[in-house]
């Protein structure tokens, strides 16, 4: 058991190793997320180990929507298109179309037995797209490659636990609700874990576990660059999951327990960044570097996002609406939640643990910060 703190109270959670062992043995665990995110708990199990009894348990005592997290690769193999083209869910939960297994004894698709068969079919290498009826009663979720190191959601946690247990990277999850229909929070989830003798762990601890064992970035360049703002140290990192290249520019040296002025920036093309550093003026960039020069030390990260095209389309849609309402201001390009984990790993490599975050928007709490080994100690307007 390990201890975690919430609302100034110490609560006992299980270790990630204990949870992996239970997943390997076909048991259900409870996974809780950050209180600043959904602040909920899910029953989680490996899809490979699913049984009708497990589905019935989840439906009876979880009471939420039973879903099956799958890898991007598996969703593509089964031709599972996204439920919607424009995902406006605040947590960006990636629902595909719902499905049922055709034939194989499946009737209505909703019984515990039918749903267990459908889940099993999703990981069966012989299952073809035609074998799955659409819509149905099982809701696949497309997980981000890289797991909780990319996105700190139950979807990715389920995939990570299955993979760490040596099983097919697919899971079964369901939100846990109280008997009165309200969402179960950590105190109630602890009671559920005790009642059914189930291990309970946090995504935060899973992130920390994976940070110790895995990395999604490789440093490719490290040199001093002369910019319009003076000398800065440039490090380039390549993401192992998609080969995107991200850049960190730093000034000065620091200790790990020292709060560091930091800006994490989203960008479309790194070539434009390099041009701006040496030639072209950019007001916002000027303000960032001026702040760091005045401070004497700091870091600016430029994170290339995987969904550049969709991000641009979303911004254009917002711009169109703003123009129709007489608003001239263009929508900002915001940091994608699912890419925050990449920036966190880069900050970790830069020996930055405490952050004075430069921002020109509202103060946004990031989930799983402790798991990443990071703490935002202040927000600095620039």
Residues of each region from the PLM?
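Catalytic domains of riboflavin
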Residues: 1-382
């Amino acid at each position: 058991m390990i201890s975690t703190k919430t609302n100034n109270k110490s609560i006992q959670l299980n270790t990630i190793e204990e949870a992996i062992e239970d997943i390997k043995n076909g048991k259900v665990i409870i996974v809780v997320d950050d209180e600043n995110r959904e602040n909920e708990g899910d029953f989680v199990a490996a899809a490979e180990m699913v049984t009708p009894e497990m589905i019935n348990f989840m439906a009876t005592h979880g009471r939420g929507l039973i879903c099956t997290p799958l890898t991007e690769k598996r969703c593509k193999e089964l031709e599972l298109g996204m439920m919607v083209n424009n995902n406006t869910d605040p947590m960006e939960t990636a629902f595909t179309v719902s499905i049922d297994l055709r034939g194989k004894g499946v009737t209505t698709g909703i019984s515990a037995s039918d749903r267990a068969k459908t889940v099993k079919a999703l990981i069966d290498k012989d299952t073809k797209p035609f074998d799955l009826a659409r819509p149905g009663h099982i809701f696949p979720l497309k997980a981000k490659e890289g797991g909780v190191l990319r996105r700190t959601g139950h979807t990715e946690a389920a995939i990570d636990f299955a993979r760490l247990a040596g099983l097919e990277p697919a899971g079964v999850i369901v939100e846990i609700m109280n008997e009165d229909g309200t969402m179960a929070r950590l105190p109630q989830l602890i009671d559920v874990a005790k009642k059914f003798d189930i291990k309970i762990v946090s995504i935060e601890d899973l992130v920390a576990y994976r940070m110790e064992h895995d990395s999604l970035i490789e440093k490719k360049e490290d040199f001093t660059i002369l910019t319009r703002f003076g000398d800065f140290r440039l490090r380039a990192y390549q993401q192992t999951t998609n080969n995107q290249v991200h850049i960190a520019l730093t000034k000065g040296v620091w200790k790990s327990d020292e709060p560091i002025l930091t800006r994490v920036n989203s960008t479309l093309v790194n070539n434009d960044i390099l041009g701006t550093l040496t030639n072209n003026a950019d007001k916002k960039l000027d303000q960032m570097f001026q702040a760091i020069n005045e401070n004497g030390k700091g870091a600016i990260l430029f994170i290339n996002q995987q969904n550049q095209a969709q991000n641009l389309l979303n911004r254009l849609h917002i711009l169109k609406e703003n123009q129709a309402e007489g608003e001239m201001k263009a929508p900002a390009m915001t940091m994608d939640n699912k890419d925050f984990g990449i920036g966190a790993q880069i900050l970790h490599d830069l020996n930055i643990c405490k952050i004075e975050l430069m921002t020109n928007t509202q103060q946004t709490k990031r989930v799983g910060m402790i798991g990443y080994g990071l703490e935002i100690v202040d927000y600095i307007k620039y």
